[in-house]
Amino acid sequence: MMRVEISFSYGEKKALDGVDFSAREGRLLAVIGPNGSGKSTLLKCIAGILKPEGRIELDGKDITVLSPRARAKLVSYVPQSSLPEFDFTVEEFVEMGTYFTSGSVERALKEVGMWERRSESVLKLSGGEYQLVLIARALAQGGRVLLLDEPTSHLDVNNALEVMGLVRSLGRERIVVAVLHDLNLTLRYADDVLILKKGKVTWFGPTEELTPEVLQRVYGIKFEFVRGNSGTAVVPSL
């Protein structure tokens, strides 16, 4: 289990204020909230890119005191993606900048279904395929915690569903925390939801307990949940 109890400021501006939650293996945690609510900052604090006040515990041990290398072996981070700029093969791209061990790149690419395309240029990949390669690069580190910052933000519906299906499967043996902008994907794939607004936790709990009224208080828009054969959809209420 991962326990987070942190605050963080950019200068005098409080970006995270007493954020307190836990995440477990086998349960995908989605972090949602309005723009500027601190979602990306939260992931960067857990990943060790930013240094917050407080504690981040993994199995009861504070990982904020670890060296960057030791932290990277426990926590893997996939930032918001942009299109690739340089002509590397898929395998070369995964090997770049990661603390991987012998065989870990192959295992990671196989886990996301991209091993057979390891010799292809990343410049020729679709947006969804490139996102899978980014996830593989994080998996190659072998961390127990996987952080994903808006993994579907630039994808069409079909690619987004494919990526989120993979993300959910990865969480069976890992602690997975994903910032999501799509409320429908949140309801469909997340086991637990953490809602941030102005750097504070406004709601945290199992997805099945999330209500339209909670979302209205956060986003200032009336919603309703429409249940169908493919799951529950979130739609604005007129």
Predicted regions and their residues:
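The feature captures the beta-strand-to-loop junction immediately N-terminal to the Walker
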Residues: 32-34
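Catalytic Walker B motif of ABC-type/P-loop ATPase nucleotide-binding domains
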Residues: 146-150
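ABC ATPase nucleotide-binding domains
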Residues: 212, 218-238
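Conserved ABC ATPase "signature" region
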Residues: 103-118, 123
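Helix-to-loop junction immediately C-terminal to a conserved catalytic motif
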Residues: 47
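Conserved ABC transporter NBD signature motif
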Residues: 54-62, 71
